[in-house]
């Protein structure tokens, strides 16, 4: 039975599977190149510079130089972005689930410009699942960022005399939490960016490939400190 099903599946979704594999390899190759450059020069990455900036900022605020109000306002502004994005991701998840329930009705119309890809409703559901998982990862990344930043909001105003004897309350450990929150925000942003080629995949594998190439080029520019954002 499996031998009868497998060739049919390959004929139906072979192009989509091969293009998806090529896109995954392209993304992995980019991150391998980026990792190699960062090992050689950490300041090549905007993320390294951002982490270093957050660590210096936390140590400055916790040094007791009267920056309590500024620290709270800065962290509040930091938290507002992931709060907004959590709501956005929730709406995207609901919208994606709505699409999955209408696969039989809209798959054919969305495949009007599909060049070489599958028109099967089953493959369409697989595409929707990839998109749904992407939005779920972004959602939990932003939720984690909010959680970590809320902890930092309390920890950063602890008096210096109360920090003695508690290594977990030291500026270094508080900075680690804020840096991790920043990494979660960056993860959420990158995940949403990768939703672009996944959305293009709904129209066909060719558009997935084009979208992935565009996103990798965009991320390569975004991650550089010299031209990063």
Labelled PLM ranges:
Residues 1-14:
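Short, strongly hydrophobic alpha-helical membrane anchors
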Residues 16-46, 83-97, 128-151, 193:
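Hydrophobic alpha-helical membrane-embedded segments
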Residues 36-74:
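Membrane-interface amphipathic/juxtamembrane segments adjacent to transmembrane helices
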Residues 58-69, 154-183:
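Solvent-exposed, non-transmembrane helices and loops of integral membrane proteins
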Residues 71-97, 183-209:
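Transmembrane alpha-helical segments and their cytosolic interface motifs
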